Each structure stands twice: as structure tokens, then as C-alpha cells.
Regions:
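Structured C-terminal subdomain patch of bacterial secreted/periplasmic proteins
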Residues: 175, 239-315
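N-terminal signal peptide c-region/cleavage motif recognized by signal peptidases
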Residues: 12-14
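Proline-aspartate-enriched helix->loop->beta-strand connector
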Residues: 101, 105-114, 130, 233, ...
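A short, structured surface patch at a secondary-structure boundary
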Residues: 47-101
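Basic- and aromatic-lined ligand-binding clefts that recognize polyanionic substrates
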Residues: 40-44, 48-53, 160-216
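Extracytoplasmic ligand-binding site segments that recognize negatively charged/polar headgroups
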Residues: 68-73, 135-147, 182-205, 248-255, ...
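Sec-dependent signal peptide recognition
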Residues: 1-7
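Charged, glycine-enriched surface loops/patches
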Residues: 64, 122-159, 166, 252-281
Length: 315
């Protein structure tokens, strides 16, 4: 172990001496001197950090990922949203829940990007290379991308991604009378129903487009979530109710319906959206990623499911 930490210190000092630096204040309030143009980034979260870095044109040399039952590794939503994964890139897998410190050292990073929720101590990581912590709950995807673009000097690329997204939202608003349509996003979760103020990319699209939400959802603080008991399900009703199902572990849309049945048998009778056929199931891998590819998919999905559907006149 002493040998490993000696190597960490040696590598860290070498990297910091090699490049001009900029000062960056991370979400833990730490001021960190980071390379002005990092070339060897290690990411400690696939959805929140790795996929955005790929979209910004600076894929990490090593990343957190997931493990399939057969032992192979993958980036959650990686291929679906970017076409990139461990098996078709030079990216090294460094672990899932438990991060392999030696694998990080072997990647020779000049910058490590982690999150406050990661269980690998930041004090350990910063001995390897300059380390910053970005909180995905602090401002959501827009802030994640802004910070990553600042760290990597890719503000121009981010501006192009943002402009395309804004045009997609404008087109959705031209097509759909969003201000007069209510929406909700729900998810069965351990015997209760989970609702977020803004459900990741899907929720951001719905809010940016100007749809209205049930009061119970609007009362959730931005970035927050609540568990709702079965008897309060009618409070989550809307013109359209969206839900998601997880497919990267072999799940099917029917699994989410079964999970709702377990929360409340006959639940569909308590949602007018469900009775009308306006309960919409979407792929969770597409809906939860902090990526512009995900936002584009969600705009298309929302527009497709809502355009042309009959709704009763507002009372």
C-alpha cells in the first residue's frame, strides 16, 4: 500500500508540473488548480460525467461503468446515446460501486472528475491528479455541462448543442399548445410512487416546453423528489402521465406496469390519463441521462405522443 501511495504522489506531481493550469471552484467549495487543456480525464460516473464529456468531444481515458451478468462492462446508456462504450474505444473501466485505485493510476490522468456521492475519498484521488467534484443535483444538466465545458475548454461545442436543443424546444412549442396541457412523470418505487420536481432529461424537456404540472409536483423543491403513498395517486393525475422502464438490465415495459400493480391494484382506474390511454411508457436509459442526445430523443418522444391526441375542453 505504501508503494501505491508513493506512486500516486509521484504521478500527481509529474502531471501538475507538465501543463499550464486554471483555477476551478468545485461543488465542494474547493479551489483546485487543473490543467488548462486536460488530455487524460478519468470520470467517476458514467451517466453524469462520462456521457457529457463524450458529447463535448473530450472522452475520458478511463471511466466508472456497470457490469453485466456475463462479466462484461458497459457505460449505462453509452451506446444508445453516443455510440461509445468500453468495447469500441480506448476507455478503461475502473469499477462500479468500488473504484479500482490502481486502474486510475495506470490511466495516468491529468484530471479526475468525481461526484460528492462517490464513496472513493477525494483525499485519495487528489494524490493521483488534480480532482474536482461536480454535484449533479446542483443545477442539474445545464450546470454539469457548463462546468465540464469550462474544465475542458469546449464552450463552443456546448453552445452548438444548446442552440440545437433550444430550436427543438421552440418547434415543440409551435406544434403543441403546451401551456394548456398538464403532464406528470411517476415511477413505482418500493411500494410507493416516486415523483421528482424535474425528472432528468424528460422532466427538463417538459418544463422547458412550458407544460403544466400537478400542484404536488410543483411543490417539490427544484432538484428534489418525494415518495407518494398509493392513496394520493389521484393527486398525480394529469392530461398525460409519463413513466419509465429500465431496459439495460433486461427489463421490459411490463415490469413498470407490474410494479404499479404492486403499489396499488387497479391503479389505472384512479388516473384519467391512464383510462384515456395517455399513460406513456418511455425507456429509462433515454429519459434519465444528462445528455443532449437524450434531450433530443425526449423532445421527439413527447411531441409524437401528444400531437393529435384529443383532450377534453378545459373547465
Amino acid at each position: 500500500m505504501r508503494l501505491i501511495f508513493s506512486l500516486l504522489l509521484l504521478v500527481g506531481c509529474t502531471v501538475q508540473a507538465a501543463e499550464p493550469v486554471q483555477s476551478f471552484t468545485d461543488d465542494l467549495g474547493r479551489v483546485v488548480n487543473v490543467p488548462l487543456h486536460p488530455q487524460r480525464i478519468v470520470s467517476l460516473h458514467d451517466l453524469d460525467i462520462t456521457i457529457p464529456l463524450i458529447e463535448l468531444g473530450v472522452p475520458p481515458v478511463a471511466s466508472h461503468g456497470r457490469t453485466r451478468p456475463d462479466g462484461s462492462h458497459f457505460l449505462r446508456s453509452g451506446v444508445l446515446l453516443t455510440g461509445v462504450d468500453f468495447d469500441n474505444s480506448n476507455m478503461t473501466y475502473i469499477g462500479t460501486a468500488d473504484i479500482d485505485i490502481e486502474a486510475i493510476v495506470a490511466a495516468k490522468p491529468d484530471l479526475i472528475i468525481t461526484e460528492p456521492s462517490r464513496n472513493t475519498p477525494i483525499e485519495q484521488l487528489e494524490k493521483i491528479a488534480p480532482t474536482v467534484s461536480i454535484d449533479h443535483l446542483d443545477g442539474g444538466a445545464p450546470e454539469i455541462y457548463r462546468k465540464l465545458a469550462q474544465l475542458t475548454g469546449t464552450q463552443n461545442r456546448l453552445a452548438l448543442l444548446e442552440r440545437r436543443y433550444r430550436e427543438e424546444i421552440a418547434q415543440l412549442k409551435r406544434t403543441v399548445d403546451t401551456q394548456h396541457i398538464s403532464v406528470a412523470v411517476i415511477q413505482a418505487n418500493q411500494g410507493k410512487i416516486n415523483a421528482l420536481h424535474t425528472y432528468h432529461s424528460l422532466g427538463r424537456v417538459l418544463r422547458d416546453a412550458g407544460f403544466t404540472f400537478p400542484k404536488i409536483i410543483d411543490s417539490i423543491p427544484p432538484g428534489g423528489r418525494i415518495d407518494v403513498s398509493a392513496e394520493r395517486l389521484p393527486e398525480l393525475d394529469a392530461d398525460f402521465v409519463f413513466a419509465t422502464w429500465r431496459g439495460d438490465t433486461g427489463g421490459k415495459p411490463q415490469d413498470e406496469i407490474a410494479a404499479m400493480d404492486a403499489v396499488m391494484p387497479g391503479w389505472c382506474e384512479f388516473l384519467t390519463a391512464c383510462q384515456r390511454g395517455y399513460y406513456v411508457l418511455l425507456s429509462r436509459e433515454e429519459a434519465i441521462s444528462n445528455s443532449y442526445a437524450s434531450l433530443s430523443l425526449m423532445v421527439a418522444q413527447v411531441q409524437t405522443h401528444i400531437v393529435g391526441r384529443w383532450l377534453p375542453e378545459a373547465k
